[in-house]
Amino acid sequence: MSKIIGIDLGTTNSAVAVLEGTESKIIANPEGNRTTPSVVSFKNGEIIVGDAAKRQAVTNPDTVISIKSKMGTSEKVSANGKEYTPQEISAMILQYLKGYAEDYLGEKVEKAVITVPAYFNDAQRQATKDAGKIAGLEVERIVNEPTAAALAYGMDKTDKDEKILVFDLGGGTFDVSILELGDGVFDVLATAGDNKLGGDDFDQKIIDFLVAEFKKENGIDLSQDKMALQRLKDAAEKAKKDLSGVTQTQISLPFITAGSAGPLHLEMSLSRAKFDDLTRDLVERTKTPVRQALSDAGLSLSEIDEVILVGGSTRIPAVVEAVKAETGKEPNKSVNPDEVVAMGAAIQGGVITGDVKDVVLLDVTPLSLGIETMGGVFTKLIDRNTTIPTSKSQVFSTAADNQPAVDIHVLQGERPMAADNKTLGRFQLTDIPAAPRGIPQIEVTFDIDKNGIVSVKAKDLGTQKEQHIVIKSNDGLSEEEIDRMMKDAEANAEADAKRKEEVDLKNEVDQAIFATEKTIKETEGKGFDTERDAAQSALDELKAAQESGNLDDMKAKLEALNEKAQALAVKMYEQAAAAQQAAQGTEGAQANDSANNDDVVDGEFTEK
């Protein structure tokens, strides 16, 4: 069975891993980095992903960041003169990760396990699966990020029984999961979180502070200047990271804008104490989900054996202190918070292929599921933290006499009224025979698969007629749209490959011209004019083809030059070999003379 890669598709950074033997290994990107910025740029018709895209974010307005926060919505982003869905942008990131994983493995990759925040709803999970499909990946499993982290942490501890709390604060989302580990079973007991809390929010607090201070001093609002704002974002992220290691950092942004008197510079120092003060409310927001998860799991703090930190934002000292204060435990630092999720996803890939034995993953649904009933009430069929996959049925009836149809309004959430929860979809069961109110028996069945994706069936028990749908939110993509996007992605991949081929050819031409000119110069006056003239002629023809920019012509002329240059090199080699042989002959003669002299022995004659 071909390899299944594990992908952590993050808000700010992503990572890809693969199982090698029994070890999960992070695959470094072409720049040698173990994580890749989740950034996409468009320039001159080219799609740029990762570190290169992040570097040009300041100067290139066609740059998309933190697209994960829009997954599961109908919100599109404008770039490159087009509008893109969040799924398409995410697919570009996935395609890039897939590409360098293939380069590392030396084989095609067609399957992946992709992680999502535990608190992602059905629409967000479906959007992630669609992004994988657009990128040319068969998504074998959607796994919750904290669960994947627990897999990576617990793989070498399958003989131990312990309860762990995973505290996952990423770039844009926050999750807390409580798991029980024992005998190779990873059982998620409860999960809670906040999809609108992450490292980006900590950066924003610094940005807001810098903007306010600069406005106070100079009367100019930097938040209205796109380029200045991007520079502020980069500076804020760097300052946040610096303050994890030092107690004070300097923020220096020369020529940030211009005033009436000329250019203005931003020079400011930020202390860790000030940063903690600015972000106090964000740190406070992490506490409620911790308490919620513990309550749902029915556990006290004393029953938690280990606390695992996941996500780059858990390096913030105030966050670490808050975790210690809330759990009463020193966090376990045996895992890399940036890499552990992708590693866990790769392990789950190994479970699917059978390379990892005796491991069972029991995940849960993060939010309750149900339907709207009379009076706009939300009636739950499946409670949050139910182990998945699962199925649950309940019988309902009509609300009016002779009602010919029922509308099934499917919802996800925890609020008592339907209007306050997330609509997953609507469908209708028709042709119900005329009968007094309350007589028809309508059975509604919810199914949640191992990926947390929902399907709903409504059945009239009297007529056995049923209506079945896999939930597709209003913000979801149709199969036709996914197919079109897949074709676009494939076309882009072909265009990118062609562009790379062009660049490689041009580099090869430059190298050949340089090497041949050097050889011609070195062989001047050494007696092989025929070969030198042929190489010079081929060189001139290649230069002319290079000037014209005709790739086919360049390729043909490059082959011709290589042939002539090789002939010249052979002559040079023959001459050098002959010279060496002659030199060895001279040395041999001298050695013989020396040997002959050695045969004469000096002796002493003693007269007696």
Swiss-Prot record:
> What is known about its induction?
By stress conditions e.g. heat shock.
Q: Which gene encodes it?
A: dnaK
Start-end of Acidic residues biased regions: 599-608
Q: Which PROSITE patterns match?
A: HSP70_1, HSP70_2, HSP70_3
What residue spans carry the Low complexity bias annotation? 578-598
Species of origin reads Streptococcus pyogenes serotype M3 (strain ATCC BAA-595 / MGAS315)
- Identify its protein family: Belongs to the heat shock protein 70 family.
Pfam family name, one: HSP70
**Is Ribosomal protein among the key words of this record?**
no
Location of the region described as Disordered in the Swiss-Prot/TrEMBL record: 578-608
Tell me which UniProt keywords the record has, alphabetically: ATP-binding, Chaperone, Nucleotide-binding, Phosphoprotein, Stress response
Q: Which positions carry Phosphothreonine?
A: T173
Q: Per its record, how is this protein called by name? A: Chaperone protein DnaK
